[in-house]
């Protein structure tokens, strides 16, 4: 049968605060997430032979039942009694275990794609309810744009997009476990003044002036991740040395994004060349130049 495809976009955290650890082991968060144009591609072929199969361009990526894409497909296949075979092919570009919701956005894309291909009639809210069963970031990844994310990540409020700018994404050669980072976070011991001021950030985000927004970006997980891997701090400082307005870790890391205003495109390109091919290539294994996604709505809606 004809192959269907969809794009799955990555995200960065413009502001990330953790309020408390819950009794169920999750954490209540207050964070601002922005879709970026860096994306994976997912292809689906319907087959006569039953079963869910996944292949990837990355040999080290697990493709069995623990993969979130497989879990997402299985969730809808079981609920809607889809008996035919599903063969997924993943072209992965978003860093794996990099703090950019790469696994969550692929799962969200599978939900969207199956909803379209099988005409399931699920609304975005219906998909969110199913997505949160797969992971806290999946509901956000069903959308594109900028959102305030609260609760464990499932309470979403749309926001204005980050103003147009250039984003340099750099992931070191190592990965960090989100679970390990959160387990090492002692949120009750962090003074109030060290928490990102998300409310103030939102005020200036709505005004839309980058020069007022960037000083208020923050990530409460940075200190924890940097304590585990000091190389993240080295990478941040190097990106700032190229003239970035801000260099901040995304999510639990270790990917760092550097933000450059459009008028400083040459600085961004110089940093990219140095990290990708030049004297700083030891600092990052994957380096991309991208920009904020500037259109609201679900994936390929």
Task: Place the predicted regions along the sequence by residue.
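Conserved hydrophobic/aromatic beta-strand scaffold that supports enzyme active sites
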Residues: 5, 41, 146-148, 167-169, ...
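Short, well-structured alpha-helical segments that form the helix of a local strand-helix-strand
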Residues: 123-134, 217, 267-276
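Solvent-exposed alpha-helices and their adjacent loops that cap or buttress functional pockets
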Residues: 34-35, 132-133, 139-142, 158-163, ...
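Residue-level signal for inorganic ion chemistry
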Residues: 14, 42-44, 69, 103, ...
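Glycine/serine-rich anion-binding loops at beta->alpha junctions
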Residues: 89-118, 136, 245-257
């Amino acid at each position: 049968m004809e192959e269907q495809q969809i794009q799955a976009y990555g995200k960065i955290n413009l502001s990330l605060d953790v309020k408390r650890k819950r009794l169920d082991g999750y954490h209540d968060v207050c964070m601002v997430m922005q879709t970026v144009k860096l994306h994976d591609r997912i292809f689906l072929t319907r087959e006569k032979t039953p079963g869910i199969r996944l292949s990837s361009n990355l040999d080290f990526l697990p493709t069995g039942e623990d993969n979130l894409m497989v879990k997402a497909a299985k969730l809808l296949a079981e609920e809607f009694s889809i008996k035919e075979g599903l063969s997924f092919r993943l072209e992965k570009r978003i860093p794996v275990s990099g703090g950019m919701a790469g696994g969550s956005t692929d799962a969200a894309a599978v939900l969207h794609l199956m909803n379209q291909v099988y005409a399931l009639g699920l609304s975005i809210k219906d998909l969110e309810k199913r997505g949160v069963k797969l992971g806290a970031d999946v509901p956000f990844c069903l959308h594109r744009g900028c959102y305030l994310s609260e609760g464990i990540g499932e309470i979403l409020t749309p926001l204005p997009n980050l103003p147009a700018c250039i984003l340099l994404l750099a992931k070191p050669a190592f990965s960090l476990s989100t679970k390990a980072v959160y387990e090492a976070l002692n949120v009750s011991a962090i003074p109030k003044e060290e928490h990102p001021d998300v409310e103030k950030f939102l005020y200036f985000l709505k005004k839309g002036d980058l020069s007022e927004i960037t000083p208020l970006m923050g990530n409460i997980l940075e200190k924890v991740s940097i304590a585990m891997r000091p190389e993240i701090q080295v990478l941040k400082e190097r990106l700032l040395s190229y003239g970035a307005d801000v260099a901040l870790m995304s999510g639990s890391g270790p990917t760092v994004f550097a933000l450059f205003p459009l008028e400083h495109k040459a600085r961004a390109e110089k940093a990219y060349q140095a990290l990708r091919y030049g004297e700083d290539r030891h600092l990052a294994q994957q380096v991309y130049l991208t920009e904020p996604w500037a259109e609201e709505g679900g994936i390929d809606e």
